Amino acid sequence: ILGMLAAVKNRPAATLSGPPPKPGQPAMTYFMSFKRGMETLPQACADYIGKESIRLGASVRAVEPRGKEWSVFLTSGEELTADHVILGTAAYDSANMIKGFNANLATQMSAIQWSSSATVTVAFKREDVKVPLRGFGFIVPKVENRRINASTYSSIKWSYRAPDDSLLLRAFVGGGHHEELVHDLDDAALTAAVLEEMDTILGLKSAPAFSKVYRWFKG
C-alpha cells in the first residue's frame, strides 16, 4: 500500500486527474452502477430469456449428468432436462447438488468458509452530518473493534442516489467481524448500533430520515 501511495504522490498531477471534462459533461468517475440498482441486470436477462422460461421459488435438490444432457432434480419431485447447467449458488449449496456424481469436488466446495453480513443504509440532510465528507467512504480497522466494518457515501459516489441537500450513507456489518450482530439483532437494533458508530465517527445531529437493512446469511 505504501508503495502505491508513493507512486501516486510522485505521479504528475495531470495524469492523476486526466483532462478536464468538456463543458456540460460530468466529471469522470471510477464508480459505475445501474441507476435503478443491481436488479437491472437480472431483469434485463429475464426480459431477454423470456419470463415464461423462468422458474421462481423452485429449489434444486441435485444435478446429475445423463450422457450429453443433465438432469435437474427439484425438491418438489420434478425432474428437468437441460443441455447445460450453470450453478450460480453459494458453494455450500452447490456442493449438495453435485455430491451425487462428484463427491471430491463437493467436499472441496463444502470447505469454503462463508460468513453472514448486512448493510444498513441511512439518509440524512447534509447539515445533519457534522464532519465534512471527503472521498467516497471509509474503512474501519479491525483493531478498533467497532460494530461496523466500513461505510460508503453512496450519494457522493453516485450523485443521483439522493437530492442535492441530502446524503445517503451505507454501513457494512458482519462478515469476519462481529458476525453475531447480523443474526442476533432485529432491524431496529442493528440500525441503532450502526448509528451509534457513525455518530462517533461522523457526528450526527438528528435521526435518519430513512433507513433500510439488507442481510445475507452465509453469503
Give the role of each language-model region.
Residues 1-63, 69:
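Active-site/ligand-binding neighborhood in enzyme catalytic cores
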Residues 56-169, 175-184, 188, 196-201:
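Mid-domain catalytic core of redox enzymes
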Residues 13-16, 121, 206:
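Residue-level signal for secondary-structure boundary elements
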Residues 49-52, 76, 205-206:
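Short glycine/proline-enriched coil/turn segments at helix->beta-strand junctions
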Residues 176-178, 191-219:
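Flavin (FAD/FMN) cofactor-binding core of flavoprotein oxidoreductases
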Residues 37, 189-190:
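Soluble or luminal CAZymes and related metallo-dependent hydrolases
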Residues 1-12, 148-162, 219:
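Phosphate-binding glycine-rich loops and adjacent basic patches that engage nucleotide phosphates
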